[in-house]
Structures are given as C-alpha cells and as structure tokens.
C-alpha cells in the first residue's frame, strides 16, 4: 500500500527515507526503510517532504546537487549535499562532505538529483481525523486492504487501524479529506460489514468445496425419504441428524429438503451404514391371514403392542376392507408399519415367527379334533353286520358303550336310581370289556331261556332285562319302562340313531303309564328276541305280559304292587317250586350281573363268587 513518505534528517546531515505512521502535536511517528532503525517519534523540524516526481533533472558543472550515497557500510544510503566538479559523458565527478571529511566520487546521473527545496514540515502540513470502529468490525479493519477504496475516495495519504484506540486513523495533506471522511465513514463501515459477511460465506463455500472434493473419493450413501416421513427422519429439533453425525467415522451429512435426499459421507462403509440406519424411515406392509388377525392383535391389542415395542417401529396401521391403498391378497389383511429400515425388518421377523406359531397351534388343534372324531367313530363304528347270526347273538355292546361315552354327563336310565359308585356298562370301549360283556350276555341269555317258564309265573318285573341293569337296583326300586323299551329299540335296529335313547328316556320319565306306549314297547320287545321253539315264550314276552298286568287303574306302577304280587305268588306256589325257581333265578342273575360288572372294570372274571348285593336282591330285601 502506498505510504506517506518523508525524508528524515540524520545526525550526520544526510536525509534518509522514512514513513509517517501517526501525527502528534509536535512530532511524527516515523518508521524507516528496511527497519534499519526502530520506529520512533521525530520532531517536525527534522522532517521534510520529498521532491515532486515531475521535477526537471538538469544538472551542470559547478551546481549544487544531492547525491545518493552513504558514509560507511553500516548505514543505509541517504541524500547528501554535494557539488559537481566535472562532467564527462554520462559520468559526473562529485565532491561532498561527510563525517568531517571530503569525498570525491564518480557517479552516474541516476544517483544525482537537484537540491530538495522543501522546508521542514509543520503542524499544519498534515491533516488527521479518526473514525470509531464497532466491535464486530475491528478484526476486519486491521487489514489496510479493506480501506483501499475508501482511501482513494477521500484522497487520504494513509488510513490505518489503531488497536489501542479501536479507531481508523486517516492522514492527509488536504483539508478536504476530513470532510469526505465524515461523509463516507458510515457507508464505509457498512460496506465492510457486508463484505465481511460475503467473505465468510465464500470461505465456507471454499471449505465445503474442498471437503466435497475429499469426500468424493471417500465412502458415501445417498437415499431418499418420503415427504410425509421427513419429520421422523430429522427428529425433534434435528435430534436424529445430530445423532447420526456423532457416529464415529462420519464426516458430513447433507440434506436436500426439496427432494428429501440424504447424503452421508464417512471414512468407512460401517460408519456410513450406521448413520443411515438413524435417518432412513420408510413404510412397509405385512400380509396377515384374515383368520389370524384377532390372534395377532391380541386381547386389548396386547400382542401387537408387544411386537411394536420390541421391533422399534413408530406406528402400525391395520388396513380396513374399504381401503384400497395397498394391493391386497385374497384372504389376507395388510398390516402397515412405519419406522426405520432396521425396525421394519425386526417386525417382519417377529410377525413371521408369531404366524408360524399360530399355524402350528391351529394344526395341533385340528389334529386333536380329528383324534376326537376318530374316537367317536371307533365308539360308534363296531356295529354288527345284520347278515351274521353270530353278531346278533353277541348283542350290540359297542353301540351302548359309545352312547355312554358321548353323553358322559347323563346316564341312560329310567326312574330307578343307582349308587354313586356304580359304573354303567355302556361307558367303556375296551376290547376286554366288550368280550366279557358278550360272554356274560350269552350266559344270561341261556339262563333267561331256561328260566322262562318259571319267571312267567313269578314276578317278572325285576327280571325284565338282567343284562342291562345292576342287581343292586332291584332292592331300591324298579327302573322305568322307557329305558327298557329304548334299549330294545336300539337292539332291534342297530343301524339307527343310538342317541334316540335320550328321547325315549325323557318320554318315559314324563309319561311312564301311557297304555298305548306300553303296548308298542311290548311289541318291540317281542320282536327283538329270537325264540328257540315256537311253543316257548321268551323272557321278554313274559315280562311284557306282566308289565301289562301290573298297571294300576290310574296307569302307575308302584313298589307296593310288586311286593303284594310277589307275596300272592309265593302263597300259590309250593315251597319246592319256589326254592327251585329261586335257585335258578339266582344262578341266572349272578351270570348277568357278573358280566355287567366285568365290562366296567375290565378285570378278571370272578363268576364263582357272587356279590352279596345279588343275594340280597334275590331274597327280596331292598
């Protein structure tokens, strides 16, 4: 920058080049060329202005001139007063006095100049003014280059910033400069502020350019986030971006808000990918089978809430039937999740596992239902073929047992009650039980045919069907007729509905004394048995006749009727026949009772030890 140059007189009388730094009341702050002397204050009397540049250089012999020379090697060159002694071509012989000595020297014209006629400066030679600088502009005003245009505009010789006083010092040789400074100082400071801001932006842009050039060869990731998910990606007050920038190895993150594009730069692929996981939010749907939607949601949304919490997704939306935003598969319901890419992957894994678990549970449930159905079919399926006489003789034990196993809460009996420890023969599906029941039925059937004539004379009510009831039941009361008739109907039509026992039982309990029903059931019982000879009557026939005869006038059968009937028959029958009939009846009842118990317990056949209850019933004790 152009300096205010002056000439300072030294102690040897030579004038040396110097620069004015500041103006004081009676002196100037002067700095010297090449700093051969330190900056110091010089009085006005020792300072003069240099000659103007347009001064004519016409030198002749005998004239006084000034020579640019030095007295010794330690001092710089200065202007000394000299005299031309001789001229020869471009060379001059000069004589000058220095340090109390006279020197002669041959020099060229460039080292000579006419004598400087400028006098020493005074207080009025220089004009000084100052401009206060705001605090935010002090650093910018330290550079003299910032005042280049201002100096030119005001016509100042020098403008410098004084850190001690925080002001701009303007030096000039004209008084007009002071007026111009007062006019342009505010504009100059404002322009400095604007230029400072622009320079700052330029510096940032330059740094960004340099960093971009460096990052261009580094690792980077670029992805786009939907406009409606930008808020989640940025986070509250930019928390997600700040968290991504704190990832070790991430150097820069750029965001184009117009397009929703993120650019992540880093030192490694792992660092860039980790930062991307914080910022990349998306929406994805998972297809759930319609029959599993309720189980996936859970009671009060407990299951789906647990899945959301564990996966880390932001929210979940279940698409309705009327929503057509997403493609829908047949029989499937879309579950739409919003979250980071990692959380979406987590929720897909959780749902796939949960659906697989629900399918396995459903498969196990179906297998259980199939097993139960097979058990029912096994219980109902051992029906005898009508064309095989052997099966007819064995009876239909499995049908009766299956009906008992299906309706476990209801017992298929009439009015008579049984003990709580009694187990019906209809309730087992065991092969041993079936075999023992068949054998006992054969024995009971033989005993029934052998005792048919005697039982027709005696009371037939307790001997109605020894295979289908417990001997203990005779002492407590007779069973309803409906149960015997219903069982007879099942025996007659094994291919029919075995559950008709329930209907017949209910009917017999409500209308037990219906005469027409009794006659119809009697005819069924008669047809259900095969006679061995045409002359013999079956046990069912005898029981049917006795049943018809035992009806009272009002159609009800009481225990007293059985007791009185038994006493009257015992009086009419001789003791020998009575003992014989009792003995035969006991033997037949023992066989049938033992077979029923065997079918229930599936234990060994203890036919040789009749129960005490059977004896008690035979003796007529209830």
Swiss-Prot record:
Record field: compositional bias (Acidic residues): 505-515
Q: Which stretches are tagged as biased composition: Basic residues? A: 410-420, 469-479
Q: Which GO terms describe its cellular component?
A: cytoplasmic stress granule; intracellular membraneless organelle; neuron projection; nucleus; presynapse
KH domain location: 218-279, 281-351
Compositional bias annotation for Basic and acidic residues: 455-468, 574-596
> Phenotype when inactivated?
Morpholino knockdown of the protein causes abnormalities of striated muscle development and abnormal development of the heart, including failure of looping and snapping of the atrium from its venous pole.
A single GO BP term for this record reads: regulation of translation at presynapse, modulating synaptic transmission
Region (CC1 domain) spans which residues? 201-208
* Post-translational modification Phosphoserine, affected residues: 447
Q: CDD domains, from UniProt?
A: KH_I_FXR1_rpt1, KH_I_FXR1_rpt2, KH_I_FXR1_rpt3, Tudor_Agenet_FXR1_rpt1, Tudor_Agenet_FXR1_rpt2
Note the InterPro entries from the entry.
Answer: Agenet-like_dom, FMR1, FMR1-like_C_core, FMRP_KH0, FXR1_C1, FXR_C3, KH_dom, KH_dom_type_1
Question: Where does this protein chiefly localize?
Answer: cytoplasm
- Kindly state which keywords UniProt assigns to this record, in alphabetical order: Cytoplasm, Myogenesis, Phosphoprotein, Repeat, RNA-binding
Q: Which residues form the Agenet-like domain?
A: 4-50, 63-115
Keyword Cytoplasm appears in the UniProt entry? yes
Question: Which parts of the sequence are annotated with region: Disordered?
Answer: 382-622
Q: What does this protein do?
A: mRNA-binding protein that acts as a regulator of mRNAs translation and/or stability, and which is required for various processes, such as heart and muscle development. Specifically binds to AU-rich elements (AREs) in the 3'-UTR of target mRNAs. Promotes formation of some phase-separated membraneless compartment by undergoing liquid-liquid phase separation upon binding to AREs-containing mRNAs: mRNAs storage into membraneless compartments regulates their translation and/or stability.
Domain comment, in the record's words? Disordered region at the C-terminus undergoes liquid-liquid phase separation (LLPS) for the formation of a membraneless compartment that stores mRNAs.
The protein in question is named RNA-binding protein FXR1
């Amino acid at each position: 920058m152009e300096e205010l140059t002056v000439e300072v007189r030294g102690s040897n009388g030579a004038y040396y080049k110097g620069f004015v730094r500041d103006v004081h009341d009676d002196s100037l702050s002067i700095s010297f060329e090449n700093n051969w002397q330190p900056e110091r204050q010089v009085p006005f009397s020792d300072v003069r202005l240099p000659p103007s540049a347009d001064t004519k250089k016409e030198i002749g012999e005998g004239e006084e001139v000034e020579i640019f020379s030095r007295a010794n090697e330690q001092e710089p060159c200065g202007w000394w007063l000299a005299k031309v002694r001789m001229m020869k071509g471009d060379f001059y012989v000069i004589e000058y006095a220095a340090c109390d000595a006279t020197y002669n020297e041959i020099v060229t014209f460039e080292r000579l100049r006419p004598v400087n006629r400028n006098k020493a400066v005074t207080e009025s030679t220089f004009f000084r003014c100052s401009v206060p600088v705001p605090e935010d502009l002090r650093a910018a005003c330290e550079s003299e280059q910032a005042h280049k245009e201002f100096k030119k505009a005001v016509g100042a010789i020098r403008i410098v910033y004084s850190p001690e006083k925080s002001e701009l010092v303007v030096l000039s040789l004209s008084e007009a400069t002071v007026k111009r400074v007062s006019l342009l100082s505010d504009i100059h400071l404002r322009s400095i502020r604007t230029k400072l801001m622009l320079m700052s932006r330029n510096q940032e842009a330059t740094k960004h350019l340099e960093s971009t050039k460096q990052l261009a060869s580094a690792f980077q990731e670029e992805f786009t986030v939907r406009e409606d998910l930008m808020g989640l990606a940025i986070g509250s007050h930019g928390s997600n971006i700040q968290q991504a920038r704190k990832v070790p190895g991430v150097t820069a993150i750029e965001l184009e808000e117009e397009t929703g594009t993120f650019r992540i730069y880093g030192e490694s692929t792992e660092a860039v990918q980790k930062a991307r996981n914080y910022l990349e939010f998306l929406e994805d749907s998972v297809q759930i089978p319609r029959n599993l939607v309720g189980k996936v949601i859970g009671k009060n949304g407990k299951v789906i809430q647990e899945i959301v919490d564990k996966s880390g997704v932001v929210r979940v939306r279940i698409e309705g039937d009327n929503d057509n935003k997403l493609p829908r598969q047949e029989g499937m319901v879309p579950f739409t999740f919003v979250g980071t890419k990692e959380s979406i992957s987590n929720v897909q894994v959780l749902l796939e596992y949960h659906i697989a678990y629900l399918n396995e549970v459903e498969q196990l449930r179906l297998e259980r239902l199939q097993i139960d159905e097979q058990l029912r079919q096994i219980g109902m399926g051992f029906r005898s073929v009508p064309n095989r006489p052997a099966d007819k003789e064995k009876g239909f034990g499995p049908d009766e047992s299956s009906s008992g196993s299906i309706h476990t809460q209801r017992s298929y009996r009439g009015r008579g009650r049984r003990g709580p420890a009694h187990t019906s023969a209809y309730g087992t599906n065991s092969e041993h039980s079936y075999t023992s029941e068949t054998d006992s039925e054969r024995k009971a059937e033989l005993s029934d045919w052998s005792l048919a004539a005697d039982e027709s004379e005696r009371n037939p009510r307790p001997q109605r069907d020894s295979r289908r009831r417990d001997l203990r039941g005779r002492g407590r009361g007779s069973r309803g007729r409906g149960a015997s008739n219903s069982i007879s109907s099942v025996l007659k039509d094994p291919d029919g509905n075995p559950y008709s026992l329930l209907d017949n039982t209910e009917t017999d309990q409500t209308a037990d004394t219906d005469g027409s029903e009794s006659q119809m059931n009697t005819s069924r019982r008669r047809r259900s048995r095969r006679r061995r000879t045409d002359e013999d009557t079956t046990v069912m026939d005898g029981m049917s006749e006795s049943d018809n005869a035992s009806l009272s006038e009002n159609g009800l059968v009481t225990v007293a009727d059985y007791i009185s009937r038994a006493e009257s028959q015992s009086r009419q029958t001789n003791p020998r026949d009575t003992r014989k009939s009792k003995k035969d009846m006991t033997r037949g009842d023992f066989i049938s009772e033992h077979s029923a118990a065997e079918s229930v317990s599936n234990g060994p056949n203890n036919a040789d030890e009749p129960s005490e209850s059977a004896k008690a019933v035979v003796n007529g004790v209830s």
